[in-house]
Amino acid sequence: YHKQLTKETQLSKFNQTEIEAMLGSYTKVLFIRDPFQRLIATFLQGMGSSPSFSSFVQDVLDSGTHNASVAWKPLVSLCRPCLIPYDYVVMFGFHRQELGHLLQKAGLPVESILPEFTDTQVQWTYRWLSEQMFSELSVQQKKQLSHFYHWDLAAFSFSSSFLSD
């Protein structure tokens, strides 16, 4: 796009014509992650001050979607998948396969660019962590989290998410 963009420029700062021109001139890639896994990662990184995962989840639920941190805010409110026609959606845990396809489509040499991913190990680890953390939550918290991330679960195929159950 012909305008100079700074790192801080948000799409909402442009008028509709400029937005359409920009979106039409870029390849749009969206990286997504299961919302429950995002919560676990945020908790493990110490971004909440809660002593337990259950109390952290309660803090998240109490904050609501409008006051939520970007770390756990529902994806649909951050990246607007219904408004922006993304060309590629890359799901966490499938980086090697999906990024390889994306690089190939872009005409770039796949094997020489991609780092070594351990997607299978990551999937197994997060499955185990999800089971452990999910068991700490009350039935009410589980229901509230499913509601909190309802639109993410509807917009993206997180079929193995604990929140989908």
Model-based region annotation:
Residues 1-165:
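Membrane-interface amphipathic segments in extracytoplasmic regions
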